[in-house]
UniProtKB/Swiss-Prot annotation:
NDH-1 is composed of 14 different subunits. Subunits NuoA, H, J, K, L, M, N constitute the membrane sector of the complex. It comes from Leptospira biflexa serovar Patoc (strain Patoc 1 / ATCC 23582 / Paris). Belongs to the complex I subunit 1 family. Disulfide bonds: none annotated. This is NADH-quinone oxidoreductase subunit H. The keyword Cytoplasm does not apply. It is found in: Cell inner membrane.
Amino acid sequence: MDWALILAWGIKILSLFFVILTGVAYYTLAERKFAGFIQDRPGPNRAGPFGIFQPLADGIKFIAKEEIFPKNVSKGMYLLAPTISMTCAIMAWAVIPFGGTLPAPEWLTTLTGVATIDLQIANPDSGVLYMLAISSLSVYGIMIAGWSSNNKYSLLGGVRSTAQMISYELPMGLSIVAIVIMTGSLKLTDISDSQKDMWNILSPPGFVAFFIYVTAMFAETNRLPFDLAEAESELVVGFHTEYGAFKFALFFLAEYMNMITMSCLTTLLFFGGYNVPFQLGAGSEYQAFIGLGFFILKVLFFAFLFIWVRWTLPRFRYDQLMKLGWKKMIPWGLFVVMFASIYTVYWKEGWMKLFI
């Protein structure tokens, strides 16, 4: 029985890994296509019909390129940096619930004895804390990359990115704390299930927390208008200036993986997660499939938002970035935590009725 469970978990993990890599590959293609649309050009259209094999061609190119190591680099740390970034990006997916419970296929039930499949690898009681911890650890990969490359542009990019991510983790954490106060749980499934009747963004504290969270989300993923770590006009390509071939591909994959992860987290925290509007399909055997479909649609919207903002807004100056984080975002984050506390007491206990 134990071996059967291990096999079932292995199949689930490998399936998720395949879906993640495929999704990230075609997310890069979608961004290049949208960039072409914005710039009035067709975008990638040579590798297969409509360019659908472009991600495969890019993958072969990265793998086939020669691995070059700059002189005087700390080789062990130099190789460790992209590994840390990629590992953290993958580990974050372990606690994301993509839907409810699906009936297992007959062949899987026969093979392992498992009758149902939870659309989540693990469901710890502190799923939100796990996500925040993993996002904090990813800073090490960027800082080590900047330091170990023995390049001034890389080092400046690493220092910038570290300061930026630490600065914006605080308001992001405060906005998430507001949601935790309102829902009363750190489990992502509980937070999603608590929004069956009303999404968190429709509540006054949730509405304010959403805008704080989304702003911090762009800074955390080093995307425009907050891509100060990779400012091409200033730092070549920032902390991965000295990286090429497969090592650069790991950083590239980690960045796009983090964008999709943040889109999933936004959906779970503010937009009901996998819950279906108006309880469509409630009680049917297809409810989990319907929930998964709605979850994917919500995630695709926020994934598109990353692309849209990149080709719409200009880059901040570094001093403006720091000023926004410490003088605006953190005070607003503290305010929304207090606001959520007062709102939750009123909503659950009705104490404010005493004063009306």
